[in-house]
């Protein structure tokens, strides 16, 4: 029987991050690679390693991050905007959270969880 694993790929301004989860959404693998502005080859290498590590496996894959839109289009994979992705994960796994501050290589984002979700972003730089 072929198993299915779920993959999240975050392509940021400086790095590519991957998480692999089993059918029960337990984390079974993560990796973090600097892409040195070569996102295409870094994504290919990360996905090739995944296929080698988990042969005879089907994958569901979604991409997020500031550098993921073009990759998702090229690979014909779903793209989820990074603030939406973060919000969904926090609501599901840490529902008692009041606020999330996410610092990336390109920007900083803050999400307030209250009666109404409020999101703010500094697009100038992460600092």
Language-model features: locations:
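Short beta-strand-loop/turn "lid" adjacent to the catalytic site in phosphate-handling enzymes
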Residues: 23, 32-35, 50-84, 111-121
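Short, intrinsically disordered/low-complexity patches at protein termini
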Residues: 41, 51-54, 94-96, 104
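Glycine-rich phosphate-binding loop of actin/hexokinase-like ATP-binding domains
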Residues: 81-127
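Alpha-helical scaffold segments in soluble metabolic enzymes
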Residues: 42-45, 49, 70, 88-92
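A short acidic Gly-Thr/Ser loop motif
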Residues: 10-14, 65-66, 103-107
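Short glycine-aspartate micro-motif
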Residues: 4-10, 60-62, 96-101
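Short glycine-rich, Thr/Ser-proximal phosphate-binding strand/loop in the N-terminal lobe
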Residues: 5-41, 45, 118, 122-124
């Amino acid at each position: 029987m072929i198993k299915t694993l779920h993959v999240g790929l975050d392509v940021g301004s400086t790095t590519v991050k991957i998480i692999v989860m089993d059918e029960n959404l337990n984390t079974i693998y993560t990796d973090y690679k600097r892409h040195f502005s070569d996102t295409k080859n870094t994504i290919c290498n990360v996905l090739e390693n995944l296929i080698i590590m988990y042969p005879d496996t089907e994958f569901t894959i979604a991409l997020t991050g500031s550098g993921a839109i073009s990759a998702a289009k090229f690979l014909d994979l779903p793209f989820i905007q990074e603030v939406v992705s973060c919000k969904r994960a926090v609501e599901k796994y840490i529902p008692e959270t009041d606020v999330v501050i996410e610092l990336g290589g390109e920007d900083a984002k803050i999400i307030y969880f209250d009666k109404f979700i409020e999101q703010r972003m500094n697009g100038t730089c992460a600092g």
